[in-house]
Amino acid sequence: MRIPFVAAVLVGSTLFAAGVFAQDRSHPLPLGTFVDIYTDQSVTSAQKEIGLKEGTWYEGTITVTDVEYYKNTGTGEPFAEIKDMNYRGGCYLLLFRVQDTAKALALKVGDKVVVRGMLSNIGMQTTKYVLVCETRYALFKECEILEIVKPGK
């Protein structure tokens, strides 16, 4: 009985702190904090929706699992989405939308990339990426690729 209570208090405190310190691009929260909460199967979807506020900036290292390119199909500029699907459960997909398509298109699967981005949306859908479960995704926009670390370096 004590362990679930302590876990709930810790998750609640972390969610509250993340909301209080929602900030600007120059003071991002650690992406690892987002990932820990978002992939924690004991945290409800409602708690995630409330605690992981859209508009919050995060920065951290991801592992590239795919990159997709989107052409200018109207008034918008072309962009690329860097995908990271390397989380426990396998049903979590982080999408990082970047305007620097040249850097994004140079990435290879397995590259480690330090990114900074603003949480835009979290949700759930059935996708082609995971057939055994519904994929929970988080979309980050206005992302910057800060550093690329190739495997083995």
What are the functions of these language-model segments?
Residues A7-A17:
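Bacterial N-terminal signal peptides
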Residues M1-F5:
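Positively charged n-region of N-terminal signal peptides that target proteins for export
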